[in-house]
């Protein structure tokens, strides 16, 4: 299909690693221990923020404006009919109004946990559930999404993705 996809989590990790402004703000919020040997200590940061809503909100307030700015710059450099921004917490940070359309990709909780564990073995079930606890339920997200893709079976998922793609091309 050739649609460029901006992975917000990966870009955020990169920005938190390279942006002097973000590094300084994160150290101010979480202390110098947030970086170990010049690299973001994701384990430390996760332990600090995922059980402290106030710290999580403060970290989001630091990181997400930088990600938004980076996304806009990236999107403007693309030449496709449309772009996709993959982001897990659109509704939680109140950025849903930035998008023309929201595509929610969902799966059963157990499937999500299994996939996250396969993608990054350093995760624990408890850590994943702590992050999920800070996210809205899929049922709440469905109410505000334009498209819903059930991602349980790869063949059915491909059909749904192609349907959404065709519909978006017709709306542009």
Predicted regions and their residues:
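Residue-level signal for inorganic ion chemistry
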Residues: 9, 59, 84, 149, ...
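An amphipathic alpha-helix signature
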Residues: 1, 23, 27, 109-117, ...
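Small-molecule kinase domains that catalyze NTP-dependent phosphoryl transfer to phosphate-bearing small molecules
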Residues: 79, 97-98, 119-168
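ATP-dependent small-molecule kinase phosphotransfer cores
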Residues: 10-79
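Short, acidic/turn-prone active-site loops that include or flank metal/cofactor-
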Residues: 10-13, 34, 108-111, 130, ...
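Hydrophobic/aromatic beta-strand patches that form the interior of the parallel beta-sheet core
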Residues: 6, 103, 147-149
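A conserved segment at the C-terminal end of the G1
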Residues: 1-7
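ATP-dependent NMP and nucleoside kinases share a basic, alpha-helical "lid"
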Residues: 69-77, 82-117
